[in-house]
Amino acid sequence: VRSRRDTLPGMAELGLAAWPPAPIRTERLVLRASEARDRAAFVELFASPQVGAYLGGPRTRDDLERSVPDVPGRRPGLFVTELDGAMIGMVTLDRRDADRPGHIRADAGEVELGYLFLPDAWGRGYAAEACAAALGWFAGAVPGEPVVLCTQTANVRAMRLAATLGFIEVERFEEFGAEQWFGARSSVTPSG
């Protein structure tokens, strides 16, 4: 019997295997569950003004040092992205909150892709590589289940990455005081 915390929140009905899966290896990266050694990188990630620019701003390092657990991010749906043995970011797959705008289903609850990377990792294709690996894993675990992504239209890099990953615009709306781009991606890959 699996406990709720061993499966992706709200995704048990999709028949997902217990969390975490075996580490996912790409050409340059490893996607894996969080470990205690990742704590400093989590603090750095959430304290970064560049990372927080489109997320409501950074949190203070003091607040993070007090609040980040010994093993941060240890939850279903969160992959730490590792390069050469060190955390450089994270990729998440979560259920989109039904109370937020942006849905492709009448009953809401779509799986939403999220990601954050340390600024030193930007511009090298790591986010695309890690997100593609997480999406590939998810497509294998739950064939045919669509995934959504939401980002500020001002975040040009995120908009480019969404297109690279195959997300198609569904709508735009105002949220958090900014215009948001909302897209969807089918896990069904066209053959040819």
Spans of features found by a protein language model:
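GNAT-family acyltransferases
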Residues: 1-120, 133-137, 141, 146-152, ...
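A short helix-loop-beta submotif of the ANL/AMP-binding
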Residues: 120-128
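Conserved active-site alpha-helix within GNAT-family acetyltransferase domains
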Residues: 128, 154-170
